[in-house]
């Protein structure tokens, strides 16, 4: 556990940069186009980390993103499903009034806590498993909905 925590600390600046990119990509629940744009950004990040990604098209609300990885050997023995969401409750334009920033050791901005930091943590958690040489025997599936 200490190794994983130390690893996370070494990558903190990268995590904060990605969180800033995610927060600046406004994605209000009621704006399908904005959620879809953010979903494409999230999908690209997961692809860049070796995941097989599918965009699950939705008619009325933002598309869902499914990212899948298997770090183990042989065949997966089941899967672990991690759920989250891409949309936020903040209207487009909120960012102009409440920009992303780091103050007093904390990140601030629309969607920072719910749920964009969780999306960043999930991505870096997979990288941490790899760097630690941990190979879960189950497929890792991440489903980000809107």
How does the language model describe each region?
Residues 115-146:
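Acidic/histidine-rich catalytic neighborhood of metal-dependent amide-processing enzymes
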Residues 1-110, 128-137:
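Acidic/His- and Gly-rich active-site-bordering loop/insert found
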